[in-house]
């Protein structure tokens, strides 16, 4: 069962490892990231970083989409992590049954507009996000579980 879908350019780091995995009782983390899926060193580093009792899978976006039927059958409490909005939007659209997406960290870049202290979106990312919003997906910004959710749907 998917407990959390999060966009965070840092992928697996302290906030995710200590705060989110505990608050959501996460048993499996699925990282969907095209670059990471082909980087053996980064995959090994992520496996060493994750909590010992949590399973970890790393897939490209297309591979993850091909595995959607199997992901839907998993009984673990799952967190899905993306490093960027584009890959998240592609997967969430294909999955079809994701109600919420947490925007945890999207870095500042040329042409990006600031939506919170840690979330900056380009016009293309705003458009991707608006498409998800139009499909009924609630998008929110929240760094850690103890902080208040900021509803991104109201800002885009």
Task: Report the location of each language-model feature.
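Short, hinge-like loop/turn segments at secondary-structure boundaries
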Residues: 47-49, 75, 119
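Long, hydrophobic N-terminal alpha-helical segment
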Residues: 1-55
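Short amphipathic alpha-helical segments and helix-helix/interface helices
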Residues: 46, 88-92, 129-130
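Ordered, amphipathic secondary-structure segments that act as subunit-interaction surfaces
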Residues: 59-104
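Short, ordered loop/turn segments at secondary-structure junctions
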Residues: 33-36, 61-63, 85, 105-108, ...
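Glycine-rich, aromatic-bearing surface loops/beta-hairpins
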Residues: 94, 99-156
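A general structural motif
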Residues: 8-12, 60, 121
